[in-house]
């Protein structure tokens, strides 16, 4: 009998200093059943540093969005949905999860989360297998004509660059929307993003034959709207 395979979905929300403020991991199997999860605000980071924001932005990452996000976290702490945890406590949880499940680690833009965790002292070195869920999405979902048509139909485009290029969005919000045929706005809180957006993407991808052979880096040239638009 084959040994049961588990996955660990990692998601983080960060501070202005490139460390982790909001940390989550979800342990699941191939069918998407959740066996364990960790969702905490990181002591010494969430409560001592400003959340990441962009003063030029006018969306969730701008000043107005920053105030809403801060209020949201305070409410989560007040109602018990989140608690503060030290980096040492997080590392103990991770080690216990690896010991029990030996899961493959994944995240939507894994390199980003690995870097922020390293900056914070969160130790992810115990995972034997890792892959980027964004890259898996690019090769298994986003490169398809159906996905690009869905993005066109829903105007899921990134902002035009100074060189006049506009690309399709390939973020978890749109990819999950494609899978469910219903786009829901990501809250950009770690647990909810991992559980409600990245988990459905993961289970969709790993049902595909040879999905691991189609893990490819994002290449913006392949997602230019002008190359896929038919007037």
Regions found by a protein language model. Give the residues of each.
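Conserved non-catalytic scaffold segment of RNase H-like nuclease domains
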Residues: 2-118
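Conserved protein kinase catalytic core
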Residues: 17, 138, 199
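Short, polar/flexible loop-turn hinges at active-site or ligand-entry regions and domain interfaces
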Residues: 76-77, 122-125, 182-186
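Active-site-proximal helix-loop-helix substrate-binding element of RNase H-like nuclease domains
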Residues: 46-71, 138-194
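Substrate-recognition/cap helix-loop segment adjacent to the acidic, metal-dependent catalytic center
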Residues: 111-133
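Acidic, Mg2+-coordinating catalytic module of metal-dependent nucleases/exonucleases
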Residues: 104-110, 116, 156-231
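A short, structured active-site edge motif that brings together acidic residues
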Residues: 40-43, 128-142
């Amino acid at each position: 009998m084959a040994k049961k395979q588990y996955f660990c979905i990692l998601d983080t929300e960060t501070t202005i200093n490139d460390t982790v403020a909001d940390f989550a991991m979800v342990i699941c199997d191939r069918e998407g059943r959740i066996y364990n999860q960790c969702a905490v605000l990181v002591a010494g980071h969430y409560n001592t540093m400003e959340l990441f924001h962009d003063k030029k932005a006018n969306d969730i990452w701008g000043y107005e969005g920053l105030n809403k996000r801060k209020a949201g976290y305070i409410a989560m702490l007040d109602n018990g949905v989140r608690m503060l945890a030290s980096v040492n406590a997080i590392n103990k949880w991770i080690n216990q999860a690896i010991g029990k499940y030996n899961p493959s680690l994944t995240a939507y833009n894994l390199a980003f989360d690995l870097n922020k965790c390293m900056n914070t002292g969160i130790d992810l070195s115990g995972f034997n297998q890792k892959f980027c869920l964004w890259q898996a999405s690019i090769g298994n979902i986003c490169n398809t004509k159906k996905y690009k048509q869905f993005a066109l139909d829903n105007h899921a485009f990134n902002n035009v660059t100074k060189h006049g290029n506009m690309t399709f969005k390939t973020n978890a919000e749109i990819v999950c929307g494609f899978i469910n045929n219903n786009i829901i706005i990501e809250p950009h809180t770690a647990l909810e993003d991992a559980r409600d957006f990245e988990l459905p993407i993961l289970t969709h991808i790993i049902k595909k034959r040879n999905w691991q052979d189609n893990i490819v880096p994002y290449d913006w040239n392949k997602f230019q709207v002008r190359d896929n638009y038919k007037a």
